[in-house]
């Protein structure tokens, strides 16, 4: 087993780094940030990237050509293999659509399956872009707020049932595991949400970008893996961005088993000019989702 050095300091100066650059942070957050700040505002790690990814990108650079690209067999087999090894979920290559980011996928889904004025259910407190996207798309934010009980956040399923029953609420975005409260939803909680959405014909889109970052004693369940009906009716979004700290490579996957939903999603994706692929993003996914990438991820 290779021993990786997570204690080596990496100099991020002159890397176009957003996290540590005070002027960039000040502009993004619209406030004054001192130059000696300690940035804890962004989900971005400060140790070196996994060598398997670095080496794959280095090898790709050596080919000295960077034209238009498309996902090939190694990309699809890597994604399918990762889901099988990590979560025992059998994903078919044709279910997978490459998208620059999970946030972009949420935007595409909202525009594909709702109309202006429709309600989109989210569970605040949640990742800020969820609400921002809904508002920017001229949809209504419908908050099924989490409740804090005995030092733990829980879902208000009774309220969710009532909100889902309203015909104007067409779609729900679930964060699983939840950002920022950190809950890893149980199989029972996920099933309850899915059944409510199925019952009331609400399209459930699940953001599972943090699926790999789960403490010992807890288990992440890909929502679509829990029931064949969920595969046919819902959408799962994932990416290596948080696991391997590669958000700058702009690579994520929408997993949509239902062909009709997938084709509608991809039609909107093209209309929004979000069907572009990043050469290095494809290489990153193919390298990260390997045994070597998993070994790096698991090291304590």
Predicted regions span which residues?
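Short glycine-rich anion-binding loops that position phosphate/pyrophosphate groups of nucleotides
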Residues: 43-45, 176-179, 242
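Alpha-helical elements of Rossmann-like donor-binding domains used by nucleotide-donor carbohydrate transfer enzymes
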Residues: 52, 56, 78, 155, ...
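PLP-dependent aminotransferase class I/II
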Residues: 233-300
């Amino acid at each position: 087993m290779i021993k990786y050095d997570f204690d080596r300091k990496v100099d991020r100066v002159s890397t176009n780094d957003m996290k540590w650059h005070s002027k960039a942070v000040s502009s993004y957050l619209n406030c004054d940030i001192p130059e000696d700040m300690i940035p804890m505002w962004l989900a971005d790690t400060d140790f070196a990237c996994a060598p398997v990814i670095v080496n794959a990108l280095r090898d790709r650079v050596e080919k000295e050509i960077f034209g238009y690209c498309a996902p090939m067999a190694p990309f699809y087999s890597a994604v399918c293999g990762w889901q099988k090894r990590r979560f025992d979920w059998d994903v078919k290559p044709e279910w997978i659509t490459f998208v620059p980011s999970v946030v972009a996928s949420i935007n595409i889904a909202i525009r594909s399956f709702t109309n202006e004025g429709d309600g989109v259910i989210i569970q605040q407190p949640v990742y800020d872009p969820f609400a921002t996207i809904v508002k920017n798309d001229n949809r209504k934010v419908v908050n099924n707020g989490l409740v804090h009980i005995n030092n733990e956040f829980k879902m208000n399923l009774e309220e969710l049932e009532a909100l889902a029953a309203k015909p104007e609420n067409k779609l729900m975005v679930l964060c699983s595991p939840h950002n920022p409260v950190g809950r890893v939803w149980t199989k029972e909680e996920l099933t309850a949400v899915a059944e409510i959405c199925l019952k009331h014909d609400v399209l459930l889109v699940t953001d599972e970008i943090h699926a790999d970052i789960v403490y010992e004693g807890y288990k992440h369940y890909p929502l679509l893996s829990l029931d064949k009906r969920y595969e046919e009716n819902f959408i799962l979004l994932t990416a290596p961005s948080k696991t391997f700290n590669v958000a700058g490579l702009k690579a994520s996957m929408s997993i949509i088993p239902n062909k009709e939903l997938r084709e509608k999603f991809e039609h909107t994706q093209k209309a929004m000019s979000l069907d572009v692929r990043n050469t290095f993003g494809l290489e990153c996914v193919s390298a990260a989702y390997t045994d070597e990438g998993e070994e790096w991820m698991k090291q304590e």
